């Protein structure tokens, strides 16, 4: 007998490196949660990474972009999510210098689409996965310096600017509409996947 689902989480960018590890963690730790992965499978996403969970009855993969408002709203209507965790992003500094528009579209407009859907469908929590790149650079000759939550935003590329803009938009939705949000700004990640 299938256990009753206690929570449904839409994980955007879940076929990427960090997102897929989050998917694995959540399905292992919370077997009574439903995880819906929304990913358009750009250069950063790899569907084969999710192969170990494809047969899990509490997992669903949807190949769509967070910039596609109709697809996002349709998914929210089908799944009735409790929470959204947004890993989806264009995320390479050098690529952002070559083609900034795609970074603006995905990282800002895509976040806007998600925020509107969260507001419309009354989600309980939205988590924005951001980057420490929004803080700028630390001097190499000062290993004693660190970024912290109060460090001012000081972007240095189209990538970091697009992520900072998305973060500010998320905070604006919290303040304006009372949407429950959190933001994490992690540094580079590495590991086996």
Over which residues does each language-model region extend?
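N-terminal Rossmann-like NAD(P)+-binding domain of SDR-like oxidoreductases, especially those catalyzing
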Residues: 2-192
